[in-house]
């Protein structure tokens, strides 16, 4: 039996660590230099334990959803 999300230690504990992982995902997927990426908005969902980070670069924007416990990117949606 595994503990609930509230009892598990989160690897993405801070907003800065979530932004860092999101930028890393964007640089790998879209081949963009990290200094060209701007953080537009961040949100933490207490119910699911997921971080949502909106990033923008050039004329593109994307929302990245990450699991705060496993510190992995779950999905990247370009908008």
For the regions a protein language model found, what residue spans apply to each?
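Long, terminal "pre-/pro-" and other extracytoplasmic accessory regions
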Residues: 1-79
